[in-house]
Amino acid sequence: MPDKFKRVHVVVMDSVGIGEAPDAAKFGDFDVDTFGHIAKHVGGLKMPEMGKLGLSNIREIEGIKKAEKPLAYYTKMQEASNGKDTMTGHWEIMGLYIDTPFRVFPDGFPDDLINQIEEKTGRKVIGNKPASGTEIMAELGEEHVKTGALIVYTSADSVLQIAAHEDVVPLEELYEICEFCRKITLDDPYMLGRIIARPFVGEPGAFVRTPNRHDYALKPFKPTVMDALKDGGKDVIAIGKISDIFDGEGVTESIRTKSNMDGMDQFIAVLDKDFNGMSFLNLVDFDALFGHRRDPQGYADALVDFDGRLVEVMEKLTDDDLLIITADHGNDPTYTGTDHTREFVPLLVYSPRFKNGGSELELRKTFADLGATVADNFDVKMPEYGTSFLRDLK
């Protein structure tokens, strides 16, 4: 068995699927292929760094040459859990199996839930649709200020958000309302991943969000590989929305990010730190800005930008580092609707230690194989699900 790695870096390209999963039809998805359809839409993707790692060796992506000698071990992973959302994907990556999917409400929330909120608060609810926070604030903020009605909205993720002006609904009241919403949406039929308080201030036409946002998430129902690492005295550095996804569980340091490029900046800064454990980065723009908005050109540009930053990442890695690049679900921007798509995700595993490059790994039947590999590397408690591929990395 080769020496273990001192640091493992997991990079999740949020929603960058690599082709329809065998059970996609069960999720209402037919002929979905995030990576493939984006590449086709733009007449080929220019991602030379991902190409060198072996992206097109997993399956050919237009514009990206197959590597004769891929630098990374490569395959794709199939999601086992019964869902295609961010929390399900990430929780499975870290060793959990999710039987009941988190619910999404692309047409707004049912009357029953809205009625409960109105009865409890004595305030009307306006909005009740998927929207970007800044847009709905501009659209309904003035009505909210005049009437005191709550702006309730969602996104393509499993989330209920409540926006309110701090002079109209005091923070304490807004937080109490969100706590009530959290309580009543823990189980079916709602099963929401997250409730978010979104306070704002200002005048019509110039409303701005304040830093007093508060998230009411669900904690993972069992310990994950992150908990095992933390309990084993290892570092778990969460970059981007990772800490939110796990509600802070198993995290030793959390670094917020403003965008994909800021995420890469923060990640590259973390690579300069001396630590023993895992860094875990989520790059959300692929999903939030381009997948849900069905913008294949914007998505393609973001992929090219990401590829361009990999040069800096590779320069910082030593033989003590293992880099794992993957995704958490698909979100084909050429598909109908605005929802995620049920897809395989890419898996690229690289270390400068691999002097002869990588080769194909077996197809992974669960994302949890990734978490199992991390646990195996650090000799901490193995997750219930997942099989380590550490021994296949020569």
Curated annotation (Swiss-Prot):
Residues annotated to bind Mn(2+) 1: D14, D328, H329
GO MF annotation: an example: manganese ion binding
EC number: 5.4.2.7
This protein's GO CC annotations: cytosol
Keywords, alphabetical: Cytoplasm, Isomerase, Manganese, Metal-binding
Class of the enzyme per the UniProt entry, highest EC level: isomerase
Entry-linked InterPro entries: Alkaline_phosphatase_core_sf, DeoB, Metalloenzyme, Phosphopentomutase_DeoB_cap_sf
CDD domains xrefs: PPM
Keyword Metal-binding: yes
Keyword Cytoplasm found: yes
Catalysis performed (reactions): 2-deoxy-alpha-D-ribose 1-phosphate = 2-deoxy-D-ribose 5-phosphate; alpha-D-ribose 1-phosphate = D-ribose 5-phosphate
Cofactors demanded by this protein: Mn(2+)
Subcellular location(s) of the protein: Cytoplasm
Pathway field: Carbohydrate degradation; 2-deoxy-D-ribose 1-phosphate degradation; D-glyceraldehyde 3-phosphate and acetaldehyde from 2-deoxy-alpha-D-ribose 1-phosphate: step 1/2
A GO BP annotation: nucleotide metabolic process
Cofactor note: Binds 2 manganese ions.
Domain of life: Bacteria
Positions contributing to Mn(2+) 2 binding: D287, H292, H340
Protein's job: Isomerase that catalyzes the conversion of deoxy-ribose 1-phosphate (dRib-1-P) and ribose 1-phosphate (Rib-1-P) to deoxy-ribose 5-phosphate (dRib-5-P) and ribose 5-phosphate (Rib-5-P), respectively.
PANTHER family listed in its UniProt record: PHOSPHOPENTOMUTASE
Family as reported in the entry's similarity comment: Belongs to the phosphopentomutase family.
Protein's name according to its UniProt entry: Phosphopentomutase
Source organism: Listeria monocytogenes serovar 1/2a (strain ATCC BAA-679 / EGD-e)
